[in-house]
UniProtKB/Swiss-Prot annotation:
The modification Phosphoserine is found at residues 78-79, 82. One of its GO terms (biological process) is protein ubiquitination. Residues 107-131 have a biased composition (Pro residues). GO terms for cellular component: cytoplasm. It comes from the Eukaryota. Pathway: Protein modification; protein ubiquitination. Keywords: Acetylation, Phosphoprotein, Protein phosphatase inhibitor, Transferase, Ubl conjugation, Ubl conjugation pathway. This is E3 ubiquitin-protein ligase PPP1R11.
Length: 131
């Protein structure tokens, strides 16, 4: 059986787009632009003084802390302002000494009757620091 073309319809849609460009000519006004330039902040780096002790005669220098912590500040807050809150830690897992100003961590010394504790796996092994 052969089918016929009955019932088939075709629709053609035509769209016309008109663009109008308006150009306004105005006299340039006396406008000024003020730019304030700021000196770049120097990169932070560790510098050793002449009285810094050699780290285990290895030719390396040692600081009192393994990392430098910068407290987050709000935009526009001066970096020279200091608060009492600077005793917070940096929350780095590798930081053994913590960030307590003028305080040493107090750990009880093992007594002869107390068996030695296994090392904490979250702390680095004792020895020279490797970064």
């Amino acid at each position: 059986m052969a089918e016929t073309g009955a019932g088939i319809s075709e629709t053609v849609t035509e769209t016309t787009v008109t663009e109008t460009t308006v150009t306004e000519t105005t006299e340039p006004e006396n406008q000024s632009l003020i730019m304030k330039l700021r000196k770049r902040k120097p990169e932070k780096k560790v510098e050793w003084s002449s009285d810094t002790v050699d780290n285990e005669h290895m030719g390396r220098r040692s600081s009192k802390c393994c990392c430098i912590y910068e407290k987050p500040r709000a935009f526009g807050e001066s970096s020279t302002e200091s608060d009492e809150d600077e005793e917070e830690g940096c929350s780095h897992k590798h930081c053994v000494r913590g960030h307590r100003k003028g305080r040493r961590p107090t750990t009880p010394a093992p007594t002869p009757t107390t068996p030695p504790q296994p090392p904490d796996p979250s702390q680095p092994p004792p020895g020279p620091m490797q970064h």
